[in-house]
């Protein structure tokens, strides 16, 4: 067996033993040894492989798998292929999503020589990876490689650090890159690292506390709000926008005199959507407690930064929550806001699709108008760095990981940016993903920012950037179905999501 084949097979074996069940593979020559090994491992039933042409899109598919609770490996060939996954790596870092990058490389003697498709890939992702290392050509295909892979997967999942995120193994291969024969994988010996239990930090909170639940906060935010009798300001992707304590239009309430009476803020997850919340968290007279494992005190005023929390002592004010609920009064929505509200409600029904929400103006419509009920949708978004790129690819990854249909709601620019992620190879499994495009002809978010004061031609060209895009023709070219509906035509929300669908909703 040639050395490259031996390392590739041992690498795949070690990934599976460490618990990796999903791999996104981008075809190339230098990563071919891993490709052959993956094909044999998939035939043996060890894992699932998803082949994608575009590395940028592939990175976000892998990110979506990680968001779905299925840490995935992402395999690329050398050169610019590696650079193209950088956006997904940065999002995984900021959002704390496991992502295991395996980049194939030329051997070190070919670096800095002008060799084809060769650049310095070591450290290409800067400080983003939780672990980054080279596997040089000739590295032994033995227990040392197993241990390295286990370290990488453990770092990615945050099993020991409580800080999941991307890792990078740069694997160099010398010729020959083709195996001598097929691989027949043998029985596996699972190798896992158990996480260290972390005792919750007991907190003593004053009566006039509010709970802010940002992206990924989970159900703990709701539980703490209920225990304390506190208002819950929960973003749509917090996982806690549900129950009697949660407010709908908390941004408007934060503009009232109530905010002057706030004594403390308990922050869970990663809040990014609301300037009123940011102003509240920046107040020096308010005690801010955040549970993030990474430092996220943007304003620099947090009194406590901790891990898991529990309430040790609670001062209660029976009227406190009622005052906030009374101030949370309905606002007349626009057609776009009304549609976001209705989509949210439709995704709370049994067997509803997973909801993936695009960045920019769309998620802010959900944030102001998604009414908390008894059940919250499974709602996800890329809020680590809040870019519009890769949203559709992320949704596809979420669907592959959960095995559930996905409804992804985006603006027209977000759709244009990532529509190519709907392209699917003839041999690849068909995802059930419905892309709802709220088409208001450009970047509507800028109309609500200070840039709205720019001269109309400047605003239109430099910020709104409307596109001439035939979404129906593009969808059909990529193999997806397409339909155009009015904002009041909600029938599509009652129909099953099967295959790749694009639903365009003109708003202008």
Swiss-Prot record:
Reaction catalysed by this enzyme: isochorismate + 2-oxoglutarate + H(+) = 5-enolpyruvoyl-6-hydroxy-2-succinyl-cyclohex-3-ene-1-carboxylate + CO2
SUPFAM superfamilies: Thiamin diphosphate-binding fold (THDP-binding) (SSF52518)
Top-rank lineage group of the source organism: Bacteria
Cofactor(s) demanded: Mg(2+); Mn(2+); thiamine diphosphate
GO terms classed as biological process: menaquinone biosynthetic process
Top class in the EC scheme: transferase
Keywords from the named record: Magnesium, Manganese, Menaquinone biosynthesis, Metal-binding, Thiamine pyrophosphate, Transferase
Alphabetical list of InterPro entries matching this protein: MenaQ_synth_MenD, THDP-binding, Thiamin_PyroP_enz_TPP-bd_dom, TPP_enzyme_TPP-bd
The record's free-text note on cofactor binding: Binds 1 thiamine pyrophosphate per subunit.
Pathway: Quinol/quinone metabolism; 1,4-dihydroxy-2-naphthoate biosynthesis; 1,4-dihydroxy-2-naphthoate from chorismate: step 2/7; Quinol/quinone metabolism; menaquinone biosynthesis
One protein family per Pfam: TPP_enzyme_N
GO molecular function: 2-succinyl-5-enolpyruvyl-6-hydroxy-3-cyclohexene-1-carboxylic-acid synthase activity; magnesium ion binding; manganese ion binding; thiamine pyrophosphate binding
EC number: 2.2.1.9
Subunit annotation: Homodimer.
Function description: Catalyzes the thiamine diphosphate-dependent decarboxylation of 2-oxoglutarate and the subsequent addition of the resulting succinic semialdehyde-thiamine pyrophosphate anion to isochorismate to yield 2-succinyl-5-enolpyruvyl-6-hydroxy-3-cyclohexene-1-carboxylate (SEPHCHC).
Family affiliation: Belongs to the TPP enzyme family. MenD subfamily.
Name of the protein: 2-succinyl-5-enolpyruvyl-6-hydroxy-3-cyclohexene-1-carboxylate synthase
Organism: Cutibacterium acnes (strain DSM 16379 / KPA171202) (Propionibacterium acnes)
Name of the gene this protein is made from: menD
């Amino acid at each position: 067996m040639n050395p490259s084949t031996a390392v590739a097979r041992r690498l795949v074996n070690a990934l599976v033993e460490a618990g990796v069940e999903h791999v996104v593979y981008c075809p190339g020559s230098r990563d071919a040894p891993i490709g052959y090994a993956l094909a044999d491992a998939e035939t043996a039933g060890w894992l699932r492989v998803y082949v994608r042409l575009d590395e940028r899109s592939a990175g976000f598919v892998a990110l979506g798998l990680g968001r779905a609770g299925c840490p995935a490996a992402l395999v690329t060939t050398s050169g610019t292929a590696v650079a193209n996954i950088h956006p997904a790596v940065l999002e995984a870092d900021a959002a704390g999503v496991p992502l295991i990058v395996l980049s194939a490389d030329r051997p070190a003697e070919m670096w800095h020589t002008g060799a084809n498709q060769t650049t310095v890939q070591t450290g290409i992702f800067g400080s983003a990876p939780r672990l980054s290392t080279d596997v040089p050509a000739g590295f032994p295909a033995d227990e040392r490689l197993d241990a390295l892979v286990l370290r990488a997967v453990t770092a990615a999942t945050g099993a020991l650090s409580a800080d999941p995120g991307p890792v990078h193994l740069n694997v160099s291969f010398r010729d020959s890159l083709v195996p001598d024969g097929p691989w027949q994988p043998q029985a596996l010996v699972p190798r896992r690292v158990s996480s260290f239990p972390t005792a919750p930090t007991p907190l003593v909170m004053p009566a006039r506390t509010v709970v802010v639940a940002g992206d990924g906060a989970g159900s703990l935010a709701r539980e703490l709000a209920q225990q304390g009798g506190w208002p819950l300001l929960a973003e749509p992707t917090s996982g806690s926008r549900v129950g009697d304590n949660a407010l709908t239009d908390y941004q408007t309430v934060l503009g009232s005199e109530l905010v002057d009476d706030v004594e403390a803020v308990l922050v869970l997850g990663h809040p990014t959507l609301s300037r009123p919340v940011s102003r509240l968290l920046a107040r020096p007279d308010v005690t801010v407690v955040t549970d993030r494992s990474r430092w996220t005190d943007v304003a620099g005023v947090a009194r406590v930064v901790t891990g898991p929390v529990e309430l040790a002592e609670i001062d209660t004010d029976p009227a406190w929550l009622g005052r906030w609920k009374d101030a949370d009064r309905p606002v007349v929505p626009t057609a776009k806001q009304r549609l976001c509200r209705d989509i949210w409600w439709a995704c709370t029904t049994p067997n509803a699709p997973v909801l993936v929400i695009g960045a920019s103006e769309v998620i802010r419509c959900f944030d102001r108008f998604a009414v908390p009920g008894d059940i919250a949708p499974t709602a996800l978004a890329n809020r680590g760095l809040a870019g519009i790129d890769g949203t559709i690819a992320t949704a596809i990854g979420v669907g592959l990981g959960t095995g559930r249909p996905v409804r992804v709601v985006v603006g027209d620019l977000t759709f244009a940016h990532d529509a190519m992620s709907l392209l699917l190879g003839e041999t690849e499994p068909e995802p059930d993903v419905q892309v709802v495009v709220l088409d208001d002809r450009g970047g509507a978010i800028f109309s609500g920012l200070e840039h709205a004061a720019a001269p109309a031609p400047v605003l239109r060209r430099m910020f709104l950037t409307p596109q001439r895009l035939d979404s129906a023709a593009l969808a059909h070219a990529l193999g997806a179905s397409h339909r155009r509906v009015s904002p009041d035509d909600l029938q599509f929300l009652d129909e099953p999501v099967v295959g790749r669908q694009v639903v365009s909703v003109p708003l202008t």
